Design a protein with these regions (language model features):
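Class I S-adenosyl-L-methionine
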Residues: 1-122
């Protein structure tokens, strides 16, 4: 039997996916669920060589983007709100820098994904 990890990160899921890819793990499966007003992402990973993940793949999940589960649009809108909130907080504190630029880019990427998904009727 093959050994694997099952992970359900509560926050900073993009960093978890990025860490897995950079440290000898490949994401084999993912699941999304929505319960009690919260989104949850579950990752199944195993040892192996992973392709480099784009920022959007890290944020929404490479398997999710490929399989397009029914909750993906809702999850993407949730992640969009998270990054918009981060930007708002940083703007209120007049904070700029790498983290600000990352969240700006993520907002654009998720908005673009949602527009494409809507155009495709997903």
């Amino acid at each position: 039997t093959k050994e694997y990890l099952v992970l359900q990160p509560n926050n900073r899921i993009g960093l978890v996916r990025g860490y897995l890819a950079e440290h000898g793990f490949v994401i084999r499966d993912e699941a999304l669920c929505f319960e009690n007003g919260r989104h949850y992402a579950i990752i199944r990973a195993e040892a192996g060589e992973s392709p480099r993940l784009s920022a959007l793949e890290q944020e929404l999940g490479p398997v999710n983007l490929q399989k397009r589960p029914s909750l993906l649009a809702s999850y993407a809108r949730h992640r969009l709100k998270v990054h918009e909130s981060i930007l708002y907080t940083m703007e209120q504190g007049e904070i700029r820098g790498e983290a600000y630029g990352f969240s700006q880019g993520m907002v654009r990427s998720i908005q673009h994904y949602l527009e494409e998904a809507e155009d495709e009727g997903i």
